[in-house]
Regions:
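Active-site-adjacent structural elements that line small-molecule/cofactor binding pockets in enzymes
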Residues: 1-167
């Protein structure tokens, strides 16, 4: 249907530590990570013959008109995220995720995922990735019930705030 771009399709590869950087940096074009670790970015850049292309951080947020509603939603659908990459990589099934996250409290989620209608707080949650040298940050809006409302009410103003943070 479409022609492939000249030079091929760039490939982004998720990494979590020194071993994955050493193994995948020579193979991939872009780094993807879920933790704002500057050592991943610098290690990727050093391990690639062409240097750093893009370093893409991925971070969950949970916008809702009410902060408690956002916390409840993030706890219900994303509480596993607080365990970090090493825990997530070792959980092969939904049952494993449930078991590993069964004792995660709502306040734990609120401390690790920016939740609520405060766009400044949501934007600030990206700052650690910028400080770590990431070139791009992908926001994951938790939950499906509020996606359209998020897009209609918050996405544009949030994007403006994020652009203002960019170096």
């Amino acid at each position: 249907m479409w022609d492939a771009p000249d030079g091929g399709v760039p490939i982004g590869l998720a990494v979590s530590g020194e071993r994955s950087v050493e193994r995948f940096a020579p193979l991939g074009d872009h780094l993807i990570a879920v933790e704002p670790d500057g050592e991943l970015v610098s290690g990727w850049s050093k391990a690639r013959p062409a240097g750093l292309a893009r370093a893409i951080g991925q971070i969950p947020i949970c916008w809702a008109p009410d902060r408690q509603q956002a916390i409840d939603l993030a706890h219900e659908q994303f509480r596993w995220f607080g365990g970090g990459w090493y825990v997530n990589a070792d959980l092969p099934t939904p049952a494993g995720f449930d078991a590993a996250s069964q004792f995660v409290r709502k306040e734990d989620v609120a401390g690790s995922i920016a939740c609520g209608p405060d766009l400044d707080e949501l934007a600030e949650s990206v700052r650690p990735y910028l400080r770590a040298g990431f070139t791009d940050v992908a926001l994951v809006q938790v939950g499906d019930a509020l996606q359209q409302e998020f897009l209609d009410k918050a996405a544009g103003p949030l994007l403006d705030k994020l652009r203002a943070l960019a170096p």
